[in-house]
Each structure stands twice: as structure tokens, then as C-alpha cells.
Amino acid sequence: MDQTQNTIAGIGEINGSIKTEINAIATVDDSNEKLNQIINSNQKILELLHQLKLTVSSFTPASQLHLLQRLNSLVMELDNMAKLSDKCNIQVPIEVLNLIDDGKNPDEFTKDVLNKNCIAKNQVTKGKSDAFKGLRKHLLEELEQAFPDEVDRYRDIRASYAAEAKRLAQTQSVLPNGDAKVKSEL
């Protein structure tokens, strides 16, 4: 394959990946559009139910036609929402539905799930960090028995590096973890 063919093949691969990304973005936009249509349909249904309640609460034989029109509008909107829901695939955990049935805020479920996941990941990370600290300590103890002079030099180098990093961080308004301090403007 010559240089021109390589270039054309490379461009084809780039175009293919761009098309894939565009299709993925279009799919997300399409899903959001469908979800927005369902939300709008829900709002219309709530509005129609409210109007229907008002019509029924002040019902007179003369308002029967008006009541039937509102009932027909509600049925049409429910049918529209059913059609829209077939196009939109949203999975809601049963726990969220149970919370709603119990009159609780479904955001609590999301908060609990995120907290549990974060706590679990933090514990795993802390365990790994503690294991590495223990390994480092054990290695230093073993090295100190075998090479005491080298370990002393290593500790001196680490101490001077830590002092320099701390001094540099203080002069540059950088936190020890590498984050920059941000001054709040009031």
C-alpha cells in the first residue's frame, strides 16, 4: 500500500469514527426529544385533569357537552402519551416506585445509591492505599537492615524534596495535593 492509499484509508477511518460519534450524539438528542415530549404530554394531562375536576365540580346539564369535550381531550392525550412511551425506553428502579408510593422523595434513592457507591469505592481505595503504605514501611525496614547508609540518604532526599515542595506550594498558592487555591472575590 503506498502513501496515498494509507492517507485515504486513514481519512476513511477518521470519517467513520466521526460518523459514529455523530450518530451517538443524534441518538442522545433523539432520546432527549422523546423524553421532553413525554414530559410535555404529562403536563397536558395534569392540566386536563385539573380542568376536568373543575368542570365536574360545577356540573350542570348545560355543561355536559363541555365535559364530554374535556373527557375526549384527556383520552386523546393519554393515547398520545401511550404512543410516545412506546418510543422511549426508560428504566425506573422498583425502589423508586416504592418510595413514591410511600409518599417519599425519590431523590433519596439516588442520594443513597450514590453515597453507597462512593463509600464502597472510597473503602477499596483506602484499603489499597493502606496496603501500599504497609508495603513501603516493610520494604524500608528490610532495606534499612541491609543498607542502612543508603536508606538514610533516601530519607534525607525525601525530606528535602518534601520541604522544597511545601515551600514551592506556599509561594505559588498551591495546595499540597496539587490543587490551586482560589481566592473568592466578594
Curated annotation (Swiss-Prot):
Q: Which organism is it from?
A: Arabidopsis thaliana (Mouse-ear cress)
PANTHER family tied to this protein:
MEDIATOR OF RNA POLYMERASE II TRANSCRIPTION SUBUNIT 10 (PTHR13345), MEDIATOR OF RNA POLYMERASE II TRANSCRIPTION SUBUNIT 10A-RELATED (PTHR13345:SF14)
Q: Which residues form a coiled coil?
A: none
> Which residue ranges traverse the bilayer?
none
Where does the record say this protein resides? Nucleus
Recall the GO molecular function terms of this protein's record: transcription coregulator activity
The similarity comment for this entry is: Belongs to the Mediator complex subunit 10 family.
Secretion signal span: none
Supply one GO BP term.
regulation of transcription by RNA polymerase II
Outcome of substituting residue 88 to S: Loss of oligomerization. Loss of oligomerization and dimerization
Q: How does it assemble?
A: Mono-, di- and oligomers. Component of the Mediator complex. Interacts with GEBPL.
The UniProt function text for this chain reads: Component of the Mediator complex, a coactivator involved in the regulated transcription of nearly all RNA polymerase II-dependent genes. Mediator functions as a bridge to convey information from gene-specific regulatory proteins to the basal RNA polymerase II transcription machinery. The Mediator complex, having a compact conformation in its free form, is recruited to promoters by direct interactions with regulatory proteins and serves for the assembly of a functional pre-initiation complex with RNA polymerase II and the general transcription factors.
Going by the UniProt record, its keywords in alphabetical order are: Nucleus, Transcription, Transcription regulation
* Superkingdom of origin organism: Eukaryota
A GO cellular component annotated for this chain's UniProt record is: mediator complex
Q: Which InterPro entries does the UniProt entry name for this protein? A: Mediator_Med10
Q: Which gene encodes it?
A: MED10A
The identity of this protein, by name, is Mediator of RNA polymerase II transcription subunit 10a
